Amino acid sequence: EAAPILDAYLQAGFVFVAFKLRGGAGVDEIHPVVLRYRGSEPCVPIRLTRIAAVDDMGIRAFFLGQHRVAPTNYRHVLINPIQIDWGALAANYDAVVTLAVDGDEASGHAFVTEYAGNASVVARNDVEPPGLDGAAFVGLRANAVVAELVRQHMLDCSITDDLGNTFDETGGPCTALHPLVGPLLEEFFPTPAWTTPAEWWRDLDGSEEYDTTDWPAEEFAARFEERIAGPAEHAGDLLLANVYLTRLYTTMSPAEMTEDPTFHENPMLPPVSNQFSATVVSDCDGPTHVELADGRVIQYDDAGQPPVFEDMPYALAVEQVPSSGAPMVLLDHAAAIDDELDAWNAAQDGGCACRMVALRSDALVLFGLFALGARARRRRIA
């Protein structure tokens, strides 16, 4: 299956870089690889992905730049919020996206925008923890490495009491707080077969056996700088240099992975909030209902269950986004969706009561994508 896919890339003049995992090496030794090339058209090589893909596989792409990013050769889809199961904290979100991008005019080649706006939504400390310093390991005794990693917030070896208060910073089993810290420690201090990495790193701290400077500290420091501190600093610099962050999402099955999506910036596109919200209202005088952020209401049935709209579109609209100007709407289901919703609501018996705010719950799902509020109504007592 791979041969024709690779041949298609070669016929188009693509260049490949191949990597082979060394014999005996584990997957934990695989490190991120960054390739830089001149170009102005970001691309996700999705055709290669189909070799090992599964049905409805989630694909999320982040873009840092000066403006919002949109797909070039794929469609852009707005999902229908009425099909979201708000009462279950949007547990069916992936299914809604899948059905929306698989619908008419999208045909499995489309993305939804989950966020578009100021890149400051990601704090620099989240990608570049303060205090990272490879030079701190130079000249350090081997049995002090764990303590230094704890100090730089790369390991957590703390012991806490029942109230969550820390009373020992390095006395407990250690957990790596960065995916490359564990492999780095294993490279220089391999875990014996009779124990676990978490316990071994704890025992290594202050160990008399490793109370020595006769170990490749400079090499460890260089690896730490190359794999952890340096990339973190670069990520922080990228956040500072690019004011706009776009997050796109889709799901695809192997049969749909026939074209690599490309992307472009469009300075005229509006921002997209990552707060996709609704309010669930429980009414003592009638069925529960949901109030969407745009003011529309979804009535529940008399049993307190949300409606199931089997024939209602999952896409609110399907668009083609140019490099400048407003999106071109290829398919607009808004009127049909409203008609079906109105017909459902008209068939339900709604109660009447005074509204009181009883609960506000912000359930941040998928990068703060959803916020669910709940309010209760009760009768006014004279």
Where are the regions a protein language model picked out?
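Accessory, solvent-exposed terminal regions and/or long lumenal/extracellular loops of proteins
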Residues: A3-N345
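Compositionally biased, charge-rich terminal segments
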Residues: A346-G350
